[in-house]
Amino acid sequence: DPFNPVIKDGRIIGRGVNDMKSGLLCALYAMHLIRKSNIKLNGNIICAALCDEEGAMIGVKDFVQTSFAKNLTSAIVCEPEENRICIEQKGVAWVKIKLIGSMSHGAMPYSGINSSFPMGMILTELEKLNDKYKEFSSKYLGTPSVTPTIVQSPSIEGGVPQNNVMPGDSELVLDIRLTPEIDYANFKKSLDAIISNINAKYKIKIDIELIETRPPVKVDEN
């Protein structure tokens, strides 16, 4: 039972022990030892136990707005990472793309605007970006990537899919992982070019929503 932690051979085994209660414990214990040894520091150390790391990161977003974070100059993140010291982290952007056509019966497809074909074209062009992004590979992080995680036609609001009904609206969510060599603005420029070409061919309304973005981070090796 992962939700019932046990101690075995001097180790705690259970859900969340490694990621990331052990990191939090190490940080607290290090602060305890520094205080106990009476080492004089040229500043303050703050231990921040923050929530929602897997989601919208509301914990750290709130923390950086507080007076505690005002004068911070650096941070150590105690993520386990297979016991390796990490000096780079990929950035991420989640983007929702909605194609707005008009639904029609399968027997009369030309009376509506089918969003599935332009959606397929978007996916094809985005796949080509992954090859292009190899030139932005990082020594430690590998290659940036564009990954469709949700593809829906019709969209959630568009109703239940049916064999004989042509979808009007379609929806796509992308998970974009960025290295320090490329930023979101670079990706957005490529996406805008793709959308422009599709609009010229299909004359369909396309909305782009940036759900969340976090920049890549790089620390000098020295």
Predicted regions and their residues:
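Short, conserved micro-motifs enriched in small and acidic residues
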Residues: 13-25, 40, 110-116
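Short beta->alpha junction loops/turns
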Residues: 17, 52-53, 112, 180
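Metal-dependent amide/peptide-bond hydrolase catalytic core
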Residues: 80, 87, 94-222
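Acidic/His- and Gly-rich active-site-bordering loop/insert found
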Residues: 1-15, 36-41
